[in-house]
Amino acid sequence: MGVPAVPEASSPRWGTLLLAIFLAASRGLVAAFKVTTPYSLYVCPEGQNATLTCRILGPVSKGHDVTIYKTWYLSSRGEVQMCKEHRPIRNFTLQHLQHHGSHLKANASHDQPQKHGLELASDHHGNFSITLRNVTPRDSGLYCCLVIELKNHHPEQRFYGSMELQVQAGKGSGSTCMASNEQDSDSITAAALATGACIVGILCLPLILLLVYKQRQVASHRRAQELVRMDSNTQGIENPGFETTPPFQGMPEAKTRPPLSYVAQRQPSESGRYLLSDPSTPLSPPGPGDVFFPSLDPVPDSPNSEAI
């Protein structure tokens, strides 16, 4: 009631549209590829040959209207993006170092690169490389490989790959080139730093525990001194009055008593002497015949004792 029915004819239309979108997206995903570098760092001694390699992963579009260009150039490491700057390798421009499909482009003959100690190679597995012969420290830098897919002379996809070449001068630098990944070296460095931090922490743990123990001892000693001082202050108060406390419900409020005060006074005795004298007052001298104990009258003899 009140809900319009959806026409059945719209369902096939939506299904056809979704199927077309899915096929277009899947076709784009299948046609996508990327460029990778097996090694990101090459270390070569001076005078050796350095071969830098890039690799295309994924299916590449095929057809008469599709052209794949692969080229090499020098660049620098940027803060945001690498391989943005284009510089020629040994005075060779970008057009001179281009591949066309799996073969070299027609305008880049083998004689021109070889005259400058360069050699380009490519295979059917997506690998393409450049070889620098008799390298010198001037050849050190960041090398980039660029792959461009053109359809009807319009660029469709553009991918980069980068690697660094370090040329070591001197006779003791070795005899062969070494290739490695910077990620591996970074992971090794991170593991070494973590291990060193653990060792330092274990060595510093006893010192930290000792400092904590000393601090607790000082705190306990200070607390004991405060308790002793409070106790001595409490004992120094003589005859304090009762503290007023709030009365409980149903009980009369206790009245506070004033502190007791007592003044010593002298009280005369029967003999005329003072039983209690003020401080620093000598006792009165005894009278003649007075002794401490009162004299007793003699007891008369009983008649019974005389008869005996």
Swiss-Prot record:
GO biological process: BMP signaling pathway; negative regulation of CD4-positive, alpha-beta T cell proliferation; negative regulation of T cell cytokine production; positive regulation of BMP signaling pathway; positive regulation of stem cell differentiation; stem cell differentiation
Listed GO CC annotations: external side of plasma membrane; plasma membrane
Entry keyword Glycoprotein: yes
Pfam family of the protein (one): V-set
InterPro entries per the UniProt record, alphabetical: Ig-like_dom, Ig-like_dom_sf, Ig-like_fold, Ig_sub, Ig_V-set, VISTA
PROSITE patterns attached to this UniProt entry: IG_LIKE (PS50835)
Region called Disordered, residue ranges: 230-308
Changes after translation: At the cell surface, may be cleaved by MMP14. N-glycosylated.
Modified residues (Phosphoserine): 232
Residues modified by glycosylation: 49, 91, 127
Membrane topology (UniProt): Single-pass type I membrane protein
Compartments (UniProt record): Cell membrane
Organ and tissue specificity: Expressed in spleen, thymus, bone marrow, lymph node, and in T-cells within the lamina propria of the small intestine. Detected on CD4+ and CD8+ T-cells, bone marrow-derived dendritic cells (BMDCs), peritoneal macrophages, neutrophils, and natural killer (NK) cells. In spleen and lymph nodes, highly expressed on CD4+ T-cell populations, and at lower levels on CD8+ T-cells. In thymus, has low expression on CD4+ cells and CD8+ cells, and not detected on CD4+CD8+ cells. Expressed in splenic and peritoneal CD11b cells. Not detected in most B cells and NK cells (at protein level).
Alphabetically ordered keywords of this record: Cell membrane, Disulfide bond, Glycoprotein, Immunoglobulin domain, Membrane, Phosphoprotein, Receptor, Signal, Transmembrane, Transmembrane helix
Induction remarks: Up-regulated by phorbol 12-myristate 13-acetate (PMA) and the cytokine IFNG.
PANTHER family for this protein: V-TYPE IMMUNOGLOBULIN DOMAIN-CONTAINING SUPPRESSOR OF T-CELL ACTIVATION
Domain of life of the source: Eukaryota
Disulfide topology: 54-145
Organism per entry: Mus musculus (Mouse)
Protein purpose: Immunoregulatory receptor which inhibits the T-cell response. May promote differentiation of embryonic stem cells, by inhibiting BMP4 signaling. May stimulate MMP14-mediated MMP2 activation.
Nucleotide-binding among keywords: no
Protein name, as recorded: V-type immunoglobulin domain-containing suppressor of T-cell activation
Disruption phenotype: Viable and fertile. At birth, lymphocyte populations in bone marrow, spleen and lymph nodes appear to be normal. Frequencies of activated peripheral T-cells are increased in older animals. Levels of the inflammatory cytokines CCL11, CXCL10, CCL2 and CXCL9 are significantly increased. Tissues show signs of chronic inflammation, however this does not progress to overt autoimmune disease.
